[in-house]
């Protein structure tokens, strides 16, 4: 089965076929680094990561570009408020974005590019637009796009803009469909604002031109997939299409993939409601990065996700169940031999996961077969039906699953330490929960090191050196490692 994706441009599910045989070129709108990213932002970034991982697993060579918007209205306003240059202000939040991605196991794109490194290209492209009469200069030195010159304007957002506000202008970056006007490509400088000197004069780019230029520079005038959150369909992505296609006369992106918003406890996320959470907020509250990632992946990207704290607890239980299963099949002394039934179950699991992801990245559907496998193999192991020769096929099924979901081989303790260090540096030590502090203590305590300590604990008990075995158990407990005695020996798990 081939990958099928819902294409916002056509309004239907289509079979994905790259423009070039085995290479996928895709562009994702990245962060606007004016503040710490919230969990709604990271739902979108995890959707991008899921598609990226699945394309690679499916054998495609990938060229994935993500931008960093490091100049826009909000950034300029906030930098001025804090008495900093744009560069000084955004450096902090760009670093924070990368730290949050690392915590959530979001892979880096092949290229992560800053808007401010491409301002000359933006200015030259605007000059081309002016020469083609699809852009015009105003008295103050700003440039605007003539939406009346692009008859297909509205084809992405499915709204007919014909004759609407003809010739009127809007100079803010974000606005509603009913306020559609000629939009700003280049903004003349205001006193005290950041500005750049270019072939079209002094000023700064509008938000929409940034992504057109960076995507076409690295991926070409036509590329395979453009991704973002549903809030970007209009005006941002609509304007990207208009700018790009009015000059190149080529289809800008073949597929447009948009993820839905999320709710928090059934309500729209809002600082005024007290339900606005960043990734590091959740980590400091004691929630594992793997649980956050799992919950954000548990609902298909085109469905609204209701992010709840009960859901986070259930996600933690689910991840622990998977990790405990993996640990069991790696460490349990199964009898020699092979049970063909177990190998068949493992192979069927791999097939079902792929089929679910081919079905418009249906992550919820992909989770079901892995938990069916865990249930059935645990029951078989309890009955003595799993053999040593079955372990490789079971581990392969887990590996294929985790190439996409990325929650099994994660050291949550190591992922948590950055948030604790950040809280201490920012004077927010009071926000560090006891659970988070405990996890941070285990930073660097790898599975291999835990295994070595567990083996030493078992050897000490066998030698009746109970003082040493108790000391090891206490050391592990302090680092969030729980030991369990079973008929097959000692097992361990992280809290």
From Swiss-Prot:
Binds 1 zinc ion per subunit. ATP binds at residue 271. Its cofactor is Zn(2+). Keywords: Aminoacyl-tRNA synthetase, ATP-binding, Cytoplasm, Ligase, Metal-binding, Nucleotide-binding, Protein biosynthesis, Zinc. Zn(2+) binds at residues 29, 211, 236, 240. Monomer. This is Cysteine--tRNA ligase. The lineage of its organism: Bacteria, Pseudomonadati, Acidobacteriota, Terriglobia, Terriglobales.
